[in-house]
Amino acid sequence: MASERLPSRPACLLVASGAAEGVSAQSFLHCFTLASAAFNLQVATPGGKTMDFVDVNESNARWVQDFRLKAYASPAKLESIDGARYHALLIPSCPGALVDLASSGSLARILQHFHSESKPICAVGHGVAALCCATSEDRSWVFQGYSVTGPSVYELVRAPGFAHLPLIVEDFVKDAGACFSASEPDAMHVVLDRHLVTGQNASSTVPAVQNLLFLCGSRK
């Protein structure tokens, strides 16, 4: 009966990179599966570009293949998203985030709305770079004074393209007046400060998303 229907689930916006540098397959898999169990999930990328998955391996290749066949695998255009329609924001680890999301005016607008309303935000690994776009007119960062984690310089320097990275999250966060912390390279490390959850790397995806779910549950 209609009167016995479960209440509608809250909406969550999952923002991923559309750049060639791609999206971590393992981080996206965990973000998508955990979040879709609790939310009505909408995936969005800049320009609605198809995601290029990186770090595909034997454990996730089948899932990625199946995901691509689903209708909801086609991302919405980030530029057309109204942040007011969503209760939570989730950004998986995306090496491509440094290329497109970190300078996205559309994402900045959404993040500023989420910040002003204290709505739950979760960013993981390279996805933390996406938060860097959210600067005010006076160039101050909306997350100034927050405690944040993300890829440490020790983790980044191992990658061949380190010298050409457009942004070092650790440096940006410290320069912007926020507090950066990191554990050992590849260690699981999650920071929760007010309504913002950040995970150091792709390995931190599951506990980071679980903290997002906890935040959303505590707001009901």
Curated annotation (Swiss-Prot):
Compartments reported by the entry: Secreted; Early endosome
UniProt signal peptide: 1-35
Assigned protein family: Belongs to the peptidase C56 family.
SUPFAM superfamilies: Class I glutamine amidotransferase-like
Chief site of localization: secreted
Keywords attached to this entry: Endosome, Glycoprotein, Secreted, Signal
This protein's name: Glutamine amidotransferase-like class 1 domain-containing protein 1
GO biological process, alphabetically ordered: methylglyoxal catabolic process to D-lactate via S-lactoyl-glutathione
Job of this protein: Component of the FERRY complex (Five-subunit Endosomal Rab5 and RNA/ribosome intermediary). The FERRY complex directly interacts with mRNAs and RAB5A, and functions as a RAB5A effector involved in the localization and the distribution of specific mRNAs most likely by mediating their endosomal transport. The complex recruits mRNAs and ribosomes to early endosomes through direct mRNA-interaction.
Single annotated GO MF: glyoxalase III activity
InterPro entries associated with the record: Class_I_gatase-like, Prot/Nucl_acid_deglycase
Glycosylated residues, chain numbering: 57, 201
Organism placement in taxonomy: Eukaryota, Metazoa, Chordata, Craniata, Vertebrata
Superkingdom, natural source: Eukaryota
GO cellular component, one term: extracellular region
Subunit structure: Homotetramer. Component of the FERRY complex composed of five subunits, TBCK, PPP1R21, FERRY3, CRYZL1 and GATD1 with a ratio of 1:2:1:2:4, respectively.
